[in-house]
Amino acid sequence: MGKNLGLVVSFYLCITFALGEYFSETRPITPKQLVVTNLHFFFHDTLTAPNPSAILIAKPTHTRGDNDSSPSPFGSLFALDDPLTVGPDPKSEKIGNARGMYVSSGKHVPTLTMYVDFGFTSGKFNGSSIAVFSRNTITEKEREVAVVGGRGRFRMARGVAQLNTYYVNLTNGDAIVEYNVTLYHY
């Protein structure tokens, strides 16, 4: 009985594979042209009251070799919703915001590892954003961070953002950073 059942199951499996059809519609595709876009804006990171745009959400209880008087000691985690503007003046035209997190990841050299979505809320890029996931050595006046993605007009973007510290208050951590971004996208 068991032998016959095995033969019947094998027979049905063979028929299923022989008669089963896989349907797929094949369409010719023409690759889209790669587009290069250059963006320029200012990022305002404010840690101080009365209206902070970045807040400390976790801080280590103790770290070795770290300066505890730093506004972002090693191991600190921050959430941010920072405004993006056309100019360095905080009152200049707002074009979007940067939302995400960064962690103080440099034990001896002040460094942030950031993952931030830069969303644009006005102009021709309204509703689009770029994603940055990179190391940011904040004591260097000029540095680069990697653009690893995007959405909207910047779908599948990749590129680099060159950062230039326009202003920084080393006591409280407030900063204004100029971004020059080169994007490659479709």
UniProtKB/Swiss-Prot annotation:
Q: Could you say which protein family the record assigns here? A: Belongs to the plant dirigent protein family.
Per the UniProt record, the source organism is Arabidopsis thaliana
Q: Coiled coil: which residue ranges?
A: none
Pfam families assigned to the protein according to its UniProt record, in alphabetical order = Dirigent (PF03018)
Function description = Dirigent proteins impart stereoselectivity on the phenoxy radical-coupling reaction, yielding optically active lignans from two molecules of coniferyl alcohol in the biosynthesis of lignans, flavonolignans, and alkaloids and thus plays a central role in plant secondary metabolism.
- Which compartment or compartments is the protein found in? Secreted, Extracellular space, Apoplast
Which residues, if any, are the signal sequence? 1-20
Q: Which residues are glycosylated?
A: 67, 126, 169, 180
Q: Which UniProt keywords apply?
A: Apoplast, Glycoprotein, Secreted, Signal
Tell me the subunit arrangement. Answer: Homodimer.
Q: What does the entry give for GO biological process?
A: phenylpropanoid biosynthetic process
Superkingdom as given in the UniProt entry: Eukaryota
Keyword Signal attributed = yes
| A GO CC term assigned to this protein in UniProt | apoplast
Name the UniProt record assigns to this protein:
Dirigent protein 4
Query: Quick one: which gene encodes this?
Result: DIR4
Q: Which InterPro entries match?
A: Allene_oxi_cyc_Dirigent, Dirigent
